[in-house]
UniProtKB/Swiss-Prot annotation:
InterPro entries: RsmH (IPR002903), SAM-dep_MeTrfase_MraW_recog (IPR023397), SAM-dependent_MTases_sf (IPR029063). It comes from Aliivibrio fischeri (strain MJ11). The lineage of its organism: Bacteria, Pseudomonadati, Pseudomonadota, Gammaproteobacteria, Vibrionales. Keywords: Cytoplasm, Methyltransferase, rRNA processing, S-adenosyl-L-methionine, Transferase. The gene is rsmH. Gene3D superfamilies: Putative methyltransferase TM0872, insert domain, Vaccinia Virus protein VP39. This is Ribosomal RNA small subunit methyltransferase H.
Amino acid sequence: MSEQFQHVSVLLHESIDGLAIKPDGIYIDGTFGRGGHSRQILSQLGENGRLYSIDRDPQAIAEAKTITDPKFTIIHGPFSGLKQYVEELELVGKIDGVLLDLGVSSPQLDDAERGFSFMKDGPLDMRMDPTSGIPVSQWLQEADVEDITWVIREFGEDKHAWRIAKGIVAYRENEENEPLTRTSQLAKLISEVAPKSFKEKKHPATRAFQAFRIYINSELDEIDTALKGALDVLAPEGRLSVISFHSLEDRMVKHFIRKESKGPQVPHGLPLTEEQIKALGSAKMKPVGKAIKPTKNEVDVNVRSRSSVLRIAERL
């Protein structure tokens, strides 16, 4: 791995322990990143074990290609395609564990050229896969106040969404201004239009940058599809281990596990026969333990782990 952009895997041992690795099992790491979790899984697999890792970031793929272990296969694509990849491998119902480490990796944040961070000047891009889709700069050039407001409010949960959106459009429409193409430009603009009484500990641009990244990469849709796909491909007693980094992600994971643990909800008093009730299906998962958060020691070593939450579930 490049010394320039090191990555420390969050909740590494807890998430791998949650998979209850079998030496001859078949596992999916839906988010290879820089390979911390994948390497840990591989270290616990025997000769007949298999690990298939997924990532859509070309830099992650380059890192994955340095692994020569014959038990390992890298798949270039979004983790929302998890079920499709497993179908092509003819392994549906045979997967012993799926790991999803959501959010942006440290190398992506630290590399100014990727445009994810307001702390470093770089092109205003934010795409997980720079070869597809459009950069944030292009979207901001075309979107109206209502659309920008919705994105910031929906994905950034920022109460100043309208004010920020209005400021972006006003800046854009002033012909004397340079086009918004740099992260530093956008961060400075947001700081200027945010209320002076805005006294959060976080930088005023934190929530907006998160919102634009989530939107431009369709992250929540990707997560929803990946969770459903994982459920479909897991073997009985197979484990799902998911690390999230903000409340929107964790809420999705929590609600998904809760919903699949309850099974179909039939309104009280609805006249259904036993056969009809059976046809509706039953609970498909069960939660394993409670949500796990990083220890103080881990946060001290890696401050970016402070908001992470690990949830584990088992296929029934």
